[in-house]
């Protein structure tokens, strides 16, 4: 069984990004990512600190706009409009969740597609769905594809199962696998025979957000297992959406939790940001 080490691959990606950032700086372009955070959600604060640290490591200028929880939707949209117009800002990321009085979809849609560091704008998602290259892609599925490449797993002709249908991971993940000529199935909470679907999959991507929902005994012998899930149990232990030990005994390759997909999601945010900066520099 091959353990697909997300930390190791993310470090490689960061090295590549740092080289790109230096090349842009030599041409007078200082790559910049702006993060907008509303309120004082503790988890959001931790995530933003991590993103700032990642940016520092590769030479990207990171700016945070931390707004009070009372910020109105109009005020937030006005800030995004200013950032869209600022040539020093190459990527914009709005940290979720937003307060309940703010329309999350309206805010994300207000980000210019040309500055959409998360790859969530409908224009960019639509471009992905019809195979247009050169647009930012959602970070987690993009990170999964890079992990498959690094593990020398070619999706072409293989049965791929994506467990989860979110707009952030599941749906774009399925599109990226389809783009690479996999035969793709999407399963979800209402799938009638999840065990049967898992048992047929050569590549399994679990992204449903339920601790150890996918039993290791279901996994096809020799399958590649990518576990996007990150769930904290009552005892504080972090586990994925797949029973790791039992699945690892059957899989040819598997990602750990933690230390698997998580570091790659953050690394691909840096990739998106530098790619957006390169478009401006052309």
Swiss-Prot record:
Q: Which residues does NADP(+) bind? A: 164-166, 189
Keywords attached to this Swiss-Prot or TrEMBL record, sorted alphabetically, are: Amino-acid biosynthesis, Histidine biosynthesis, Hydrolase, Methionine biosynthesis, Multifunctional enzyme, NADP, One-carbon metabolism, Oxidoreductase, Purine biosynthesis
Q: Which Gene3D superfamilies match?
A: Leucine Dehydrogenase, chain A, domain 1, NAD(P)-binding Rossmann-like Domain
Q: Which InterPro entries match?
A: Aminoacid_DH-like_N_sf (IPR046346), NAD(P)-bd_dom_sf (IPR036291), THF_DH/CycHdrlase (IPR000672), THF_DH/CycHdrlase_cat_dom (IPR020630), THF_DH/CycHdrlase_CS (IPR020867), THF_DH/CycHdrlase_NAD-bd_dom (IPR020631)
GO molecular-function annotation terms?
A: methenyltetrahydrofolate cyclohydrolase activity; methylenetetrahydrofolate dehydrogenase (NADP+) activity
Named in its record, the pathway it takes part in is: One-carbon metabolism; tetrahydrofolate interconversion
Matches recorded under PROSITE patterns: THF_DHG_CYH_1
Does this UniProt record's set of keywords contain Cell membrane? no
Return one Gene Ontology term, BP aspect: methionine biosynthetic process
This enzyme catalyses:
(6R)-5,10-methylene-5,6,7,8-tetrahydrofolate + NADP(+) = (6R)-5,10-methenyltetrahydrofolate + NADPH; (6R)-5,10-methenyltetrahydrofolate + H2O = (6R)-10-formyltetrahydrofolate + H(+)
EC number, as in UniProt: 1.5.1.5, 3.5.4.9
A GO cellular-component term linked to this record: cytosol
Q: Which domain of life is it from?
A: Bacteria
Q: How does it assemble?
A: Homodimer.
Biological role stated in the UniProt entry: Catalyzes the oxidation of 5,10-methylenetetrahydrofolate to 5,10-methenyltetrahydrofolate and then the hydrolysis of 5,10-methenyltetrahydrofolate to 10-formyltetrahydrofolate.
| Record-stated family | Belongs to the tetrahydrofolate dehydrogenase/cyclohydrolase family.
Per its record, how is this protein called by name? Bifunctional protein FolD
